């Protein structure tokens, strides 16, 4: 029986005899942020195990609430900051250099095809876009990873999602993953890898693939994963060119990371996305998804464009094209958070920030804040936000608030209209 790409990565990193389905694997990266890691740090210190297995393989960032909004968040940042200094972790990103982790770390070249990565964050699955196995873990596993550079994980079973066809104008990776989650359900991929393949994925940018993999967890997936290809090589080339004599050589090496034709899958889901229309969530689960047309006219109070799902430069370009020459509706607050300083700088240079500001958007520093209702865009009870984030749980962006998830194009169109609407109304700008 053949192996899936995830199983091949596991096999290459196995460091011990498996115990049933549990394998201990060697880690290429342990990523950290200020919300979950301080608990692990303090626990290790209490156990007199304040050590790290390899400072070069640990990356850390203060991103969820930055700058700190109160004494509690300041204390969390202080713990992470002092720990990074204490152990010589050069890959630490503090205020001025920091950005949303799942956009920042790939942008810095820290994720490679075939890598194994853990982090105390459920959207760690984002890194699978590069052909890596990446999983969010709890505090105990994070502690072991920091201390020993290994993690015990179930041998991966996989759901294969084949995306055929070509995206229509005004339809984006966010619409695709919402449609996939609606099909699988919020528990449909629990403890499984979601492998994204097919012509649609092949045609996607790395940013779009990261959007797909980022939301694998919303169907219960441990990890989302794509096959590395020439698009992956192009994205990473500045970081890997010293390791390969040519791009073709890198591509040849990466092409080995594919599933075998006779690999065993728990399920194969084929979707033709050629006729897919823009999607938006309703209710309080990510699998509550409808065509935007069925939610047309739903009033909104706020639009948020950003996050580890849709805060990259490609996303800001899409939104800015819709907004150019338009104004935010008087009843709507528009907020945009570029995901990293590099994204922010590029958006400035391209005139995107000027477009957002001219339209009436507030532009924030790179941060996760609003996505999880911690800062920079928290909702009041009864308010509604059309958001490019990844979760619409009850109270996610503020107690009593409602979140509708959508693409940057749909979010931008909603900001103009004051309600959920299709960006086809601004089609020439959105294409």
UniProtKB/Swiss-Prot annotation:
Subunit (UniProt): Heterodimer of LeuC and LeuD.
Gene source species: Desulfosudis oleivorans (strain DSM 6200 / JCM 39069 / Hxd3)
Gene Ontology molecular function: any one: 4 iron, 4 sulfur cluster binding
Catalytic activity: (2R,3S)-3-isopropylmalate = (2S)-2-isopropylmalate
Binding site for [4Fe-4S] cluster: 308, 368, 371
CDD domains: IPMI (cd01583)
Protein name (record): 3-isopropylmalate dehydratase large subunit
InterPro entries associated with the record: Acnase/IPM_dHydase_lsu_aba_1/3, Acoase/IPM_deHydtase_lsu_aba, Aconitase_4Fe-4S_BS, Aconitase_4Fe-4S_dom, HAcnase/IPMdehydase_lsu_prok, Homoacnase/IPMdehydase_lsu, IPM_dehydratase_rel_enz, IPMI_cat
Lyase keyword on record: yes
Keyword field: 4Fe-4S, Amino-acid biosynthesis, Branched-chain amino acid biosynthesis, Iron, Iron-sulfur, Leucine biosynthesis, Lyase, Metal-binding
Claim: 4Fe-4S is one of the keywords in the record: yes
Record-annotated membrane-spanning stretches: none
Function: Catalyzes the isomerization between 2-isopropylmalate and 3-isopropylmalate, via the formation of 2-isopropylmaleate.
Family label: Belongs to the aconitase/IPM isomerase family. LeuC type 2 subfamily.
Gene Ontology terms: biological process: L-leucine biosynthetic process
Cofactor note: Binds 1 [4Fe-4S] cluster per subunit.
Pathway named in the protein's UniProt entry: Amino-acid biosynthesis; L-leucine biosynthesis; L-leucine from 3-methyl-2-oxobutanoate: step 2/4
Chain segments annotated as coiled-coil in the UniProt record: none
EC number, as in UniProt: 4.2.1.33
Cofactor (UniProt): [4Fe-4S] cluster
Pfam families in the record: Aconitase
